[in-house]
From Swiss-Prot:
<feature type="site" description="Important for the endonuclease activity">
    <location>
        <position position="103"/>
    </location>
</feature>
<keyword id="KW-1035">Host cytoplasm</keyword>
<keyword id="KW-0687">Ribonucleoprotein</keyword>
<feature type="short sequence motif" description="YxxL">
    <location>
        <begin position="178"/>
        <end position="181"/>
    </location>
</feature>
<feature type="region of interest" description="Homomultimerization">
    <location>
        <begin position="100"/>
        <end position="125"/>
    </location>
</feature>
<dbReference type="GO" id="GO:0003723">
    <property type="term" value="F:RNA binding"/>
</dbReference>
<feature type="region of interest" description="Homomultimerization">
    <location>
        <begin position="1"/>
        <end position="79"/>
    </location>
</feature>
<feature type="region of interest" description="RdRP binding">
    <location>
        <begin position="1"/>
        <end position="50"/>
    </location>
</feature>
<comment type="function">
    <text>Encapsidates the genome protecting it from nucleases. The encapsidated genomic RNA is termed the nucleocapsid (NC) and serves as template for transcription and replication. The nucleocapsid has a left-handed helical structure. As a trimer, specifically binds and acts as a chaperone to unwind the panhandle structure formed by the viral RNA (vRNA) termini. Involved in the transcription and replication initiation of vRNA by mediating primer annealing. Plays a role in cap snatching by sequestering capped RNAs in P bodies for use by the viral RdRp during transcription initiation.</text>
</comment>
<keyword id="KW-0694">RNA-binding</keyword>
<keyword id="KW-0946">Virion</keyword>
<comment type="similarity">
    <text>Belongs to the hantavirus nucleocapsid protein family.</text>
</comment>
<feature type="region of interest" description="Viral RNA-binding">
    <location>
        <begin position="175"/>
        <end position="217"/>
    </location>
</feature>
<feature type="region of interest" description="Disordered">
    <location>
        <begin position="67"/>
        <end position="89"/>
    </location>
</feature>
<keyword id="KW-1040">Host Golgi apparatus</keyword>
<keyword id="KW-0540">Nuclease</keyword>
<keyword id="KW-0378">Hydrolase</keyword>
Amino acid sequence: MSDLTDIQEDITRHEQQLIVARQKLKDAERAVEVDPDDVNKNTLQARQQTVSALEDKLADYKRRMADAVSRKKMDTKPTDPTGIEPDDHLKERSSLRYGNVLDVNAIDIEEPSGQTADWYTIGVYVIGFTLPIILKALYMLSTRGRQTVKENKGTRIRFKDDTSFEDINGIRRPKHLYVSMPTAQSTMKAEELTPGRFRTIVCGLFPTQIQVRNIMSPVMGVIGFSFFVKDWSERIREFMEKECPFIKPEVKPGTPAQEIEMLKRNKIYFMQRQDVLDKNHVADIDKLIDYAASGDPTSPDNIDSPNAPWVFACAPDRCPPTCIYVAGMAELGAFFSILQDMRNTIMASKTVGTAEEKLKKKSSFYQSYLRRTQSMGIQLDQRIILLFMLEWGKEMVDHFHLGDDMDPELRGLAQALIDQKVKEISNQEPLKI
């Protein structure tokens, strides 16, 4: 009984501390709105962390209280001599022992799964902001994404920029862009922006602006994306003119050979793919595309558009909804995700370690991309991905950045100098450069 009393006292004490901390947080938020200097911002951040820590502790104490009550009930319950729980439906005891009781009260099954998002609501929300704050937030979540996520994990952050404001009764107030930084256990709402959803929607809406400012995710930089896109118009034009191995045109006797060759081109296969996509539209995504078309966004309407590959410059985790019905676009994103997996496999293969350690360094970008994109209502055409790989795979692998650009002869000379100097000053074994 004393344990329950102690836990209850801890809960009461932490609830009181949480009330005070939340009030201090409100005061800090008001102070930042009035005077957004570094001191006030640091105070706000510290108080947010305090509130978060108290909430976590309080939740932990409540869980401990529930466990203690459950344990007390179990202790007072008469034991069945057969070893079967009273509410178990088995007539004879299972060969397995009874394990933990999983409490599912906190789970809301009305919430969507992690693969589902309300793209129309998300798109309307993002388009409502000025372009500078959108692109700056994209930079923070792509080029500097790893650092931003690491520093803010488990919180809902707000991006602020002087270009983003709203007038309320003649008073100019900042209009913050909210992005949630979930942990592995977080449940996201359908309309909630996460870094992955933000990159997906912004890349699909503003590829031209991303191209002009050369905003790029590091994972795309290391697979040679800059090299790939520099002559995109010429590259895709040549690709479309080549013969497609998956087309066998039905031609009438006497058809000119030149016309038969025209019917075997990749361009014809892409036209057939476009016909398939035109029959598989989803209403919400159509609404988003129509809404975007009425504003400034620059979504590509064809894969040979100059800005088409820039849709994937910031490594969205799926094909953006604004170009999912453009033949070849979803497959181009899948091609990039395979290249990321290929590079990571090469990097894992060349490292020293056990087979298990090497496997941990491999990635599954392609499987994740495939699953997320197909959850939006389309099936990817694996043949198009194969065509891309046959056409550009070897060239792209040759342009991977593998973190080992030093000339072998230069490396050997540098290592010899290191070995010599280490032997002069110590009896330790020299390290490898």
